[in-house]
């Protein structure tokens, strides 16, 4: 069962977010563009997941807690390919964390308020 409304799951530049089975997206969260959320993933209040200029992938059974920002790094002169955001399975992203153009492996706990930036691998 998918719990979300069309207003908070939005297309961007021809890409519409895709969600697996039993995904929960709180009505106050926003998921935009080239985003895939794995089975049994939860996205809690006031989260922004914005795959506008690159892709975002979140594995199965992950939890994106209140107030998180998940974004990508666009291509530019110093980084011609940009950085997607890749999050593994069974990951918990603590309240108000910011993940930007990085890779987080499986079974990782990202602490509340953490910031993980472009190109980092955890």
Describe the predicted segments one by one.
Residues 1-22:
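Terminal amphipathic alpha-helical/low-complexity segments used for targeting or macromolecular assembly
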Residues 21, 26-27, 32-33, 38-39, ...:
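Left-handed beta-helix
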Residues 7, 13, 74-77, 81-83:
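Acidic/polar low-complexity surface segments
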Residues 121:
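Active-site/ligand-binding-proximal alpha/beta "capping" segment
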């Amino acid at each position: 069962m998918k719990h979300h409304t069309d207003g908070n799951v939005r297309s961007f530049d021809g890409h519409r977010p895709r969600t697996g089975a039993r995904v929960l997206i709180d009505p106050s969260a926003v998921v935009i563009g080239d985003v895939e959320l794995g089975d049994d993933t939860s996205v809690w209040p006031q989260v922004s997941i914005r795959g506008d200029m690159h892709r975002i992938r979140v594995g199965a059974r992950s939890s994106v807690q209140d107030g998180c920002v998940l974004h990508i790094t666009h291509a530019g002169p110093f980084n011609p390919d940009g950085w997607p955001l890749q999050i593994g399975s069974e990951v918990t992203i603590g309240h108000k964390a910011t993940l930007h153009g990085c890779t987080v492996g499986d079974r990782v706990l990202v602490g509340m308020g953490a910031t993980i930036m472009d190109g980092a691998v955890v």
